[in-house]
Each structure stands twice: as C-alpha cells, then as structure tokens.
C-alpha cells in the first residue's frame, strides 16, 4: 500500500520520522530535540489506525515488545555503532511485479541480497531505497553494511491481505 497521512501505518510513521530526523540533521543550530512519543499509550478519546483507545504514534508498541521502523531512523542518525535495519518486516506479504525495500543505516553504503544473490549496492545518507522483483513464494532479503546486517522474509502473493488496508471510519463502526 501507499502510506498516507491519517492511515496510521508503520510505513507512514517511518516516512514522517525520516523527514523529521533529516530536518534536525540539517539544522545544526537546534541544540536539543526529543521525539513524541517513545511508546504507544492508552488514550480513551483516540480511535486511530483501527484501534480504539490508543495513541499509536510511539516508536515502540504499547507492550514495549516491538521497535517500529521509525525507531531505527534515529539510530541511523544518532548511533555511533555501525547499524543496518530493513524496514517493512511486518508488511510481509506483498503483491506486484516489484516492491520497495527501505533500509536505514549509518554506514555510507548498503548491499541488498535476495535469496543469497546480490541485488544492488547503494550509497546514500541514512535511507537506502531499493526496488526489488520478488520471486514467487517466500523470499529472504539481507541488507549488509560492512560487518552489520539485517534479514527479513517476505512472501510474494497475488493479493495483499485486507488487514493491510485501514477501513473507513464508518466501516469500523458497523
């Protein structure tokens, strides 16, 4: 799906934080910053992203178990230890001829592998975007930057699950 404002997807949140982290980096006169919110939290008045009673804008889930992709963009900007992170692990079933693979890293270049075969090596600043043609069935993707790497499994499907599409507000109320 194409992430858009008010869809409350992890993908849209990551795009938003990519923009914010880059803005902070480009403005050296900003001597302090913080992120609102570190964790999702309960909020009775909220009905967002198909979940009632939760503000889901945190970088980590309400139960503190899952670091969302947006968490890792700040690591790419602020962490001194080499790191690489493949985005979209929870968007695991994908349809279409090609799919976009986003990688966050604080290294100058990242190499992407599909089922053990090199796809491409890119140089970028923090956000690396690859276009990949998945094979039918399950695919193992590995992003590597020097000694650090991250791996995920995606499945190429004919049609993406309905759960990937946020119902309209009036549809959720039925």
What are these regions (language model features)?
Residues 152-173:
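Low-complexity, Pro/Ser/Thr- and charge-rich linker/hinge segments at domain boundaries
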Residues 126:
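Charged DNA-binding/catalytic regions of mobile-element recombinases
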Residues 1-119, 123, 131-134, 140, ...:
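Extended substrate-binding grooves/exosites of carbohydrate-active enzymes
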């Amino acid at each position: 799906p194409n992430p858009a404002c008010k869809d409350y997807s992890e993908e849209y949140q990551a795009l938003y934080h990519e923009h914010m982290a880059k803005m902070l980096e480009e403005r050296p006169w900003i001597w302090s910053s913080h992120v609102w919110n570190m964790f999702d939290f309960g909020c009775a008045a909220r009905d967002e992203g198909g979940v009632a009673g939760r503000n889901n804008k945190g970088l980590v889930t309400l139960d503190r178990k899952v670091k969302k992709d947006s968490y890792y963009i700040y690591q790419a900007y602020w962490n001194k230890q080499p790191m690489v992170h493949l985005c979209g692990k929870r968007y695991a079933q994908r349809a279409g001829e090609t799919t976009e693979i986003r990688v966050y890293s604080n290294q100058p270049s990242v190499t992407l592998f599909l089922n053990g075969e090199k796809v491409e090596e890119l140089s970028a600043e923090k956000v690396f975007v690859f276009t990949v043609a998945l094979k039918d069935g399950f695919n193992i993707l590995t992003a590597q930057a020097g000694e650090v790497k991250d791996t995920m499994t995606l499945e190429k499907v004919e049609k993406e699950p309905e759960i990937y599409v946020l119902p309209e507000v009036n549809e959720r109320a039925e």
